[in-house]
Amino acid sequence: MIIGVDYTAAAWQGAGIGRYTRELIAATVPRDRSLRYVLFYAAGGLPPNGRYLRDLSALCAANPHVRARPIPLSPRLLTILWQRLRLPIPVEALIGKIDILHAPDFVLPPTRARALLTVHDLTFMVRPETADAGLRRYLMSAVPRSLRRADLVLVDSLATGADVSRQLGVGQERVRLLYPGVNPRFRPLPATECEPLRAQLGLPKSFLLFVGTLEPRKNLVRLIAAFAQLTAGGAYPDLHLVIAGRRGWLYEEIFAAVERLGLAERVRFLDFVDDAHLPGVYNLANAFVYPSLYEGFGLPVLEALACGTPVVTASVSSLPEVVGDAAVLVDPLDQAAIASGIARALGEHERLRAAGPSQAQRFSWDSAAAGLIDIYRTLASPRA
């Protein structure tokens, strides 16, 4: 059986779906060497020696049943050809024969094979005001069309599975739940390992941490206002807020909120943090705060739990499913509730540090890989 996996996000993106795809496929391909894999990706404009391509080369070298197949077109051009112009050029014309196509990034290329489509969330439908208008229009067209062609639909959480059925009418018999995992490098670390990173990145002695894209869905303007409320009147005089992530849609509003509230000395922005540094950054934080308005899973929350960092997160969508009883849940629309939740997490530091890693152990890439192979075999079975 030959499985084609759209590896484009993994080749291009450091976080989000890129990291999800790299972790899932790296855990899956060594498990059953009777399966063959073609990991294809849009390579036009991609630096030939980029870090993620080096990782891909190492994966292929260690697993002879896996081969990489670059397509000499950019992601944008492939999107135009396949999704906007809807040219019926099957992916097999570019990568050769496959039996199963696995598309882990919302949209399905044309194919003659049986198809597995991953839908990570429905932000563009459930919280449309938090999505870029152009991207929203594209996904509103491409995702339902891809769902109609997919044999099975993979989701990251029960919450997303319910959304896919409710919003798009996909029968539950076609939906498969596959929880993401957490890499073992995300774990409690001794201070001796973390303190050099504090100096390297210029991190304050005491800080709250957010990790993710700077965009409206992440609710950062309200988080900054809650931080101002928490520290008003001289409370928590040494506490800072560190926001780590790349700048996304409407990020300017986030920087403007910091200036408007006079917090320039208390809020620190880091650009994208290298994967190798993330476990240490989580460990150094006094608490991790993630008041997102909507998530299909919330991988940074799971990583923080695994590191033993007290977590404050939103009581909506998939997030309660991920954290269980190991975090403080707050109403993401209530600034005062966010501030109160942070204070509670700081006060319950020891309990939450112990609870987080235990909860995180419920999610592993090994379990996800075993589940994915079962799904591949289901797809390979004769059609009913």
Q: Residue locations for each model-derived region?
A:
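Carbohydrate transferase catalytic cores enriched for Leloir-type hexosyltransferases
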Residues: 1-384
